[in-house]
Every structure is written in structure tokens, then in C-alpha cells.
Amino acid sequence: MQNIMKNDNINTTYAILVNRKNPYNAKDYEKFKYINIKSTDNREIIVENITYKHFLELKDEMKKENVIIGIKHALRDKIEQQSLYEQFCIKYGKDYADKIVCPVGTSEHHTGLALDIEVKIDNEWISNNDNFDITEPILKKMHPILHKYGFILRYPKNSEKITKVPYEPWHIRYIGKSLAQYLYENKLLLEDFYNINN
């Protein structure tokens, strides 16, 4: 397979890998601009500027399919990540929390490039973890078009052995349009990109 780094048509600016083997490094993100927005539960959250711009384009496209999407989570600092883990332990149990919430320092949400998406049904935002059977079929409608807006489904089905994170139909990651298109066409994960180029 062609080495992506040698393809001048593919922009790798946003192709930073954060996972359990590659912890978050704040220096990698100093070049990006961040903005404040409102989450689906009306909290003020932070997201990378270009990521949000392309999310709005994706949102407009989904409206044409009568699907309303919004952002529940974007950037989370380490304190917020630990708090989320503790909340999940209380609500869903430690085993589930250990699977679904990445350890502090290894979450893509530290970057502001990863978004957890919720859908609105009957004028109400629906929790993914509590209503998976309802939201998953709706969220799947956006998966085939994510790459057109520079996003990938970060944790697709049957990828847990590589990503170490179970299937999350709501978790999308901005990597830029050219790379997203390449990964989509070649059915690759972000980890595969690194294995090819390192």
C-alpha cells in the first residue's frame, strides 16, 4: 500500500494519534485554535475551530435526512475525564466504565478534535449509553458520509483489538477531508495509518 506521507494530496495536520499507547501531548495542539460552544445539555464546552466548522456542515447534511445531531462532549481536560469515569462507575458499574471511558491522559477528548454526537428525537436529546438501541440505528446514517466532512468513525465495529475501545457509533474524530477520504476508501483505522507510516 502506498505510504500516505509520500502522497502530496493528503493533509496530515490533524492526524495525531491519541490512545492508550500514545498519550495526549499538549504541545501537539498548540497550532490549533479553540472556541467555546454549547453542548446538547447546555454546558459550555470547547472544540477545535475547524472541527466545529465541518461539524456544522455535517449537521446541515443530516438535517436533509430529518436527523438532528448535536455535540454532547468535545474537549475534556484530565479532571473532567476522571470525573466522567467516576460518574460512569456509579451509574453503570466499574467494568463498563473501564471499557468505555479511556484512562486520563489517553482520551481523544483531550484534543478537542473528537466529538460525541447525540440525536434529537421529539425535541429531546437522547442519551446514547441509556438508549443505545434507539440512537445507534440513527447515528449509523451519518457514518457513510463522515469522510466528506473530514471525520472518521473512530471506534467502528470489530476494531476493539486494535483501538482498545469498544464500538461507539457516536464518537467521531476530525482528521481532515483528504485523510478521512483515504481511510474510508481503504477501510483503515487511524492506528493503521500509523502502522503504515512508521
Functional labels for PLM-detected ranges:
Residues 1-198:
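Extracytoplasmic cell-surface/polysaccharide-interacting catalytic and binding patches
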